[in-house]
């Protein structure tokens, strides 16, 4: 299981492991391979309390899946979901692209 996290300015974290706990984090030379763009730029900032819209785009090469030697997705079935987590914000919120089919999803 690979977990790729990204904030609104394109800072990424990649982890791999069978469960949520004790995942191995990708080294910096691996995460540096992810191309990223953010409409908010790349400079960190404090929480913005006014209404803000933003976009982020990532290009994730096969090499980011650093525990496997993936060179093609031909003939493979993969699954993914996208989440937006604002658990540490003034107004906590959570969104997902696809439905989460468990009663109480955990976003931490």
Where are these regions (language model features)?
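Structural preference for beta-rich elements and adjacent junctions enriched in aromatics
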Residues: 1-108
């Amino acid at each position: 299981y690979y977990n790729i996290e990204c904030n609104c300015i394109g800072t990424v974290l990649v982890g791999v492991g069978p469960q949520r706990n004790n995942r191995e984090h990708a080294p910096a030379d691996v995460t540096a391979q992810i191309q990223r763009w953010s409409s908010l730029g790349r400079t960190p900032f404090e929480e913005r309390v006014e209404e803000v819209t933003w976009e982020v785009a990532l290009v994730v090469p096969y090499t980011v899946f650093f525990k496997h030697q993936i060179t093609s997705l031909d003939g493979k079935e993969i699954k993914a979901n996208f989440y937006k987590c604002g658990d540490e914000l003034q107004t906590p919120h959570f969104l997902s692209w696809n439905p989460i089919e468990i009663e109480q999803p955990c976003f931490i």
